[in-house]
C-alpha cells in the first residue's frame, strides 16, 4: 500500500503524469487507473481509521510506512490544490500518531525519522501546531535511541554493529528529518545535531572507493550507488542541507563527491 512499493507510489506516479502530460493520447486510460488506485488508497485510510486498535506491526516511515500515505496525500494537494487531500492527510495522520510511540525502525524509510518529515510537511501546509508538536516530541524520543560515536552521532539499527550511512537507513535519512525541524523552528539545537550527524557520516567516505562505505558488509569494503544506500541518497540529503547551510564547505565537497560517484564510468 505504501509509497515505496505499493498503491501510494502508483497514485503519485499517475498524478504527476496527468499533471505533466495534459494532451497525452492515453490520458483517458491513465485517468481510469488513477481513479481506481485513489479509491483503493482512500478505502485503506477509512479502514484504518475505523479500527479502534491499530494492528501491529505497522511501520511509520515516509516511504515504507503509514507516513508515506500522509505524504502522498499532501503532494496531491500541492499538485491539484484540492482541499480534500489535506483532509485525507490529516485523517491518516491520526493513524500515524498512534504508532509513533511504538516505532522500533527509527529510520527514514520505515521509521520515525520519516514520520517527522511527514508531520512537518503537514504543519507547513496547514499551520496547525499539533503536527509540529508531534514532530518535536517524536524527535526527543528518537534522539535518546541514538548513540554518540567517537566522531559524531548515529543510530544502530536492528542486528547492526554500527550506524549506517545513506538515505534509507543511515544518517542521511535522519538528516532529512532534522533539516525539516530546523527549517520550521530555527531551533539551534537541531542545527547542532545536524552537524553531529554529518560528522559521523563523512568519516564513512572512502577516498579509495570514491563512495560512502556500506557498513552492512562485515568487511567494510562494500559500497552502493543506489537511492537507498550510497552516493545518490546522500546527494539528496546534502542538497536539502544547502537550504540552511548554503556556504558550508563540507556540504559543497560532499555534493561534488556524490555527483562524481553517481556518474562514475559514464562516457
Regions found by a protein language model. Name each.
Residues 1-267:
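Glycan-recognition and catalytic cores of secretory/periplasmic carbohydrate-active enzymes
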Amino acid at each position: 500500500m505504501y509509497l515505496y512499493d505499493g498503491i501510494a507510489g502508483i497514485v503519485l506516479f499517475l498524478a504527476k503524469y496527468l499533471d505533466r502530460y495534459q494532451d497525452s493520447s492515453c490520458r483517458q486510460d491513465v485517468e481510469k487507473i488513477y481513479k481506481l488506485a485513489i479509491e483503493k488508497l482512500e478505502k485503506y485510510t477509512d479502514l484504518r481509521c475505523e479500527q479502534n486498535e491499530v494492528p501491529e506491526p505497522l511501520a511509520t516511515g515516509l516511504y515504507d510506512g503509514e507516513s508515506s500515505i500522509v505524504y502522498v496525500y499532501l503532494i496531491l494537494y500541492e499538485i491539484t490544490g484540492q482541499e480534500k487531500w489535506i483532509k485525507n492527510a490529516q485523517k491518516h495522520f491520526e493513524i500515524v500518531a498512534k504508532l509513533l510511540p511504538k516505532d522500533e525502525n527509527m529510520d527514514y524509510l520505515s521509521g520515525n525519522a520519516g514520520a517527522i518529515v511527514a508531520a512537518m510537511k503537514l504543519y507547513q501546509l496547514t499551520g496547525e501546531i499539533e503536527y509540529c508538536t508531534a514532530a518535536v516530541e517524536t524527535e526527543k524520543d528518537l534522539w535518546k535511541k541514538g548513540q554518540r560515536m567517537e566522531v559524531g552521532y548515529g543510530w544502530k539499527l536492528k542486528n547492526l554493529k554500527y550506524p549506517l550511512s545513506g538515505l534509507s537507513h543511515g544518517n542521511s535519512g535522519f538528516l532529512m528529518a532534522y533539516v525539516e525541524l530546523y527549517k520550521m523552528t530555527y531551533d539551534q539545537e537541531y542545527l547542532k545535531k545536524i552537524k553531529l550527524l554529518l560528522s559521523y557520516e563523512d568519516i564513512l567516505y572512502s577516498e579509495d572507493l570514491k563512495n560512502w562505505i556500506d557498513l552492512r558488509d562485515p568487511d567494510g569494503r562494500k559500497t552502493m550507488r543506489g537511492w537507498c544506500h550510497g552516493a545518490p541518497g546522500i546527494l539528496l540529503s546534502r542538497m536539502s542541507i544547502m537550504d540552511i547551510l548554503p556556504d558550508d564547505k563540507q556540504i559543497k565537497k560532499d555534493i561534488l563527491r556524490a555527483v562524481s560517484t553517481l556518474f562514475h564510468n559514464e562516457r
